[in-house]
From Swiss-Prot:
UniProt GO BP: translation
Native source species: Clostridioides difficile (strain 630) (Peptoclostridium difficile)
Keyword Ribonucleoprotein: yes
HAMAP family xrefs: Ribosomal_uS17_B
Name of the protein: Small ribosomal subunit protein uS17
Signal peptide annotation: none
Length: 84
């Protein structure tokens, strides 16, 4: 029997100032319930970057994991696109 699926998100790194931690901004479009307009919503997640390989501006894929600290609930899966 398989446990629940883990959430996977793709976003941009907005901060890498902490050791082994990055802040990833994930954008999504949601439909307004009354006006039916698509609204862009941005949410920030702290993610575990074990090897400190990410820089600001990188597109990364993060996956939900067990709580690693007070705020960290995601870990880095891969760097989709490096910033130039």
């Amino acid at each position: 029997m398989e446990r629940g699926r883990r959430k996977v998100r793709i976003g941009r790194v907005v901060s890498d100032k902490m050791d082994k931690t990055i802040v990833v901004a994930v954008e999504e479009f949601v439909r307004h319930p009354l006006y039916n307009k698509r609204v862009k919503r941005t949410k920030k997640f702290k993610a575990h970057d074990e090897k400190n390989i990410c820089n600001i501006g990188d597109r990364v894929k993060i996956m939900e994991t067990r709580p690693l600290s007070k705020d960290k609930r995601f870990r880095l899966v891969e760097v989709v696109e490096k910033v130039k």
